[in-house]
Amino acid sequence: MANEAVTIETPTEFAVYTVADGTAIPLNTLMKLSGDFTIIASSGKDVWGGVLWEEKTISDGITRCTVALNGVHDLTCAASAVTLGSQVCLSGANLIRVAIAADLLLGKVIGKAEEAGSAGDIVRVRVGAT
């Protein structure tokens, strides 16, 4: 996978969720909630699940992983620009976009952009801030 988050300020809030044993997920992957207390790698306009805080190796017997719920991370913009101060949400595999009103209602906002960026740019995001 590409475009994993780069942690700038260490998170202080974490959660533990269930993951599939037969899945490999790189460290710092943006995760989505896919079911009750279950996460998988983000793939679209998904409900925020956190930043994977530990690498998950395929078929290693581990079915629970820790995710960071806050902190400051460098994240990659999807096909559209992100404006300074805007709330952002998932937009694909390890990609973000500007959140719209419906994203707020559905729990998809992941944080606030602390810098602006165009498509494909890396921007700093304060995860957990609204």
Could you tell me what each predicted segment is?
Residues 1-130:
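Surface-exposed, low-hydrophobicity beta-strand/loop segments enriched in small/polar/acidic residues
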